[in-house]
Amino acid sequence: MDYNYEESIGRNIGLLTPEEQEIIRNTTISIVGVGGVGSWAAVMVAKTGFGHIIVVDKDEYELPNMVEQLFAKTDTFGKTKAEVAKQEAAKHGPFANIKAVVKDIQSVDDAKAVCQGADYIICGVDDAVARVQMDRASRELRIPIIMAANIGWRITVSTHTPDGISYEEHTHQPSLGKELSPQIAESLHLQQKVYIASIAGFTPAYVEKFFRGEVSYISYLAVPAAFAASAAVNEVLKLITGKGKTNISPNGLTFDMLNMGHLDPKEIGMRTYRIMQAVMGKGIEEGIKTWKETRGET
């Protein structure tokens, strides 16, 4: 069957102008990490009519991915996420040129390689060091990057332009202005762990296991992942069209889907700082105690 582009995206027109839709058709977007946020984003950009899509991931789908990741299905277990994302997104955007890249992001050069030629980047990778590497690569390549994450019941989305505030600066990463040494990588992972515990809405029993390293997974839900993806793709549309209000740093979206309201980044930052100081000063058990105190629990 032949698919007519104009007919397939025709109902976008009215919210988008034909001229804006043509820009979208000629735009290349790189989605790095197509597990949770990235899988939902891949479908959304295809449905919106983006003509050139790069999907990047090193992993294969497994049974536990089903709770969060759109393309984790009974017939995709053991298959690479990038290749599956390419096939699935093509069903929603048959006119799109979709490239799958099976690659682990272990350096800024790796990050640059998977984003060459892109006009926009949506970063949905989980690893703290890889997120910093993606941020640095985007600035070197002068490509706007949207950092998106679903963290328990909450989501965070922020947009970073080449001449604006970087993700590292926006989130006060310990790597800012430093080489990504093993020691800095350890600090990044610790801060990420504390931040996740501070914001996610985990149960106290899970937090104790999470801090002690007794669980091999981070607890996720599908609904926040889809919401974070929606917000990320929406950022790209606003950047392209100039419509609406973007979340360009120092702005950012931190939303609580459990209580349906925005979270105060300063409050989250102070909570994270207190727990970090406790962990670094007296160890994990003190960090757990401080987490409970900051959550109003005994």
Task: Name every feature range the model reports, one short phrase each.
Residues 162, 229-244:
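Oxidoreductase and adenylate-handling cofactor-binding alpha/beta cores
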Residues 37-38:
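Hydrophobic/small residue at the entry helix of a nucleotide-binding pocket
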Residues 170-224:
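A conserved mid-domain beta-alpha-beta active-site/ligand-binding segment of alpha/beta enzyme cores
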Residues 50-93:
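Glycine-rich phosphate-binding loop and adjoining beta1-alpha1-beta2 segment
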Residues 2-31, 218:
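A short, basic/flexible loop-to-alpha-helix module at the beginning of a structural domain
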Residues 120-161:
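ADP-ribose/adenylate-binding Rossmann-like module
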Residues 102-110:
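Conserved SAM/SAH-binding loop
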Residues 1-14, 238-298:
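Phosphate-binding loop/pocket of nucleotide- and phosphate-handling active sites
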